Amino acid sequence: MLRILLASLMFSCASPALANGGAAAPVSKPAPTILIFGDSLSAGHGLANGQSWPSLLGQRLQAENSPYTVVNASISGETTAGGRTRLPAALERTKPAVVVIALGANDGLRGLPVKQLKENLVAMARVPKGARARVLLVGMRLPPNYGAAYTEEFDRAFATVAKQEKLPLLPFLLEPVAADRANFQPDGLHPVAATQSKILDHVWPALKPLLK
């Protein structure tokens, strides 16, 4: 009698599909993720929630019914050395399909060695590639007051890494807004909210081919 009761209970707890002889419902895959891994220029320094270009990217993808979601793991003040240390945990946590590496500005502003910048960018590019994530490298440029030799070497670093690691490259994140001082907050470094859609429109053609 006990065996009959147990068998009856197990059958009643089975899924409706199985109980009726049908197939189990398919398990849905998690939405693919785009990980934005940058500094204050991507973190939205001085902006309200939802105004940064990564936030606008998420809104655009949603409006287009794209399956992709955006995780913005950018941190103000981050250098490539800090990003190199932090990236493995971020990848483990988010398991992204696409990673946008947009670091290097703070290395340049602090005058850190360009050799170190390149080594860190290479290391960061290889970690997501090893996890079969697609990588977009986003470059930065410095104002001329850092000296011609340093700024030229700094500018070339991103192209060198992209070529070596066979990565798509967006040479300069702020290309569409950099020439006009009115596009920046009082600190002269961080773009205002009104420019963020222009930055996204600049990033989009380089990013879209990676959204397979």
Model regions and ranges:
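Sec-dependent signal peptide recognition
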Residues: 1-7
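N-terminal signal peptide c-region/cleavage motif recognized by signal peptidases
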Residues: 14-15
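Intrinsically disordered, low-complexity segments enriched in small/polar residues
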Residues: 19-20, 186
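Serine-esterase "nucleophile elbow" of acetyl-processing enzymes
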Residues: 20-78, 86-95
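Alpha-helical cap/lid subdomain in secreted, periplasmic
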Residues: 66, 84-212
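Short, mixed-charge aromatic SLiMs
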Residues: 81
